A protein has these predicted regions:
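Bacterial Sec-dependent N-terminal signal peptides
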Residues: 1-22
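Ser/Thr-rich, low-complexity intrinsically disordered terminal regions
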Residues: 18-191
Length: 191
C-alpha cells in the first residue's frame, strides 16, 4: 500500500510539472519563457553556404512590413548570425459597416545557427511594442493563462480576447518570418 501511495504521488508530481498549451494557441511557452525554434534540413548544403545566406537575409531590406533589422553578431566560427528585429503587421477588423485597422508591433532577437545540411532559427526575447513601451510577451502570457486583462505601464488595457489576438498575430509573424528565411536559405549565391 505504501508503494502504491508513493507511486501515485510521483505520477501526480510529474503531471503537475508537465508543460501544457493552457491557452490553446500553440505558443512555445516553457520555463517561463517564449522561444520559437525550428530546425530545417537542407540536403547537400554546406555550412558556409547556409551561413552566408543567413547573413545576406539579415543584411537585405525585407519586402514586407519590417520596420528595422539590426545585425548584432556574425560569427563564422560558430556559423551564427544574430539580429534584432522590429516587425509590424497590420490587420483589418470589420466593425459594423466600416473596417478598422490595427497595427501590431513586436521586437525580438533572431538567431540563425548553421551546420552542414541544416540550420536552426530561434526567435526569443520577444517584446510587445506600444508607443514607447516595450513589454515582454511573457507578462502578457501570464495574464492570458490567468484569464485576466493586462494593463500596460502607459494605462492601455488588453482584455483576454485582445491578448488571444496578440498571440495569434505573433504566431502569424513568426510563421511569415520563418517562411521568408527558408526561401532565402536554399538559394545558391555562389559566384
Amino acid at each position: 500500500m505504501k508503494k502504491l501511495l508513493i507511486l501515485a504521488f510521483i505520477i501526480f508530481a510529474k503531471s503537475a510539472f508537465a508543460q501544457k498549451d493552457t491557452v490553446g494557441l500553440n505558443i512555445p511557452f516553457a520555463n517561463n519563457t517564449i522561444v520559437y525554434e525550428k530546425v530545417v534540413g537542407v540536403p547537400n548544403a554546406a555550412k558556409n553556404t547556409l551561413f552566408g545566406n543567413a547573413g545576406l537575409w539579415l543584411a537585405e531590406t525585407r519586402p514586407y512590413n519590417i520596420a528595422d533589422i539590426q545585425l548584432q553578431l556574425e560569427d563564422p566560427v560558430l556559423s551564427r548570425v544574430v539580429g534584432k528585429v522590429n516587425y509590424s503587421l497590420t490587420e483589418s477588423n470589420k466593425f459594423f459597416l466600416s473596417t478598422l485597422y490595427d497595427t501590431y508591433i513586436c521586437s525580438f532577437t533572431l538567431q540563425i545557427d548553421c551546420k552542414d545540411n541544416k540550420y536552426r532559427i530561434r526567435i526569443y526575447n520577444i517584446q510587445d511594442v506600444g508607443n514607447t513601451t516595450y513589454t515582454p510577451v511573457e507578462k502578457l502570457m501570464y495574464a492570458l493563462i490567468d484569464s485576466k486583462s493586462y494593463t500596460f505601464a502607459d494605462g492601455g488595457i488588453l482584455k483576454v480576447a485582445d491578448l488571444q489576438n496578440r498571440f495569434k498575430t505573433l504566431n502569424t509573424i513568426v510563421s511569415n518570418l520563418i517562411t521568408d528565411i527558408t526561401k532565402s536559405m536554399t538559394v545558391d549565391n555562389s559566384f
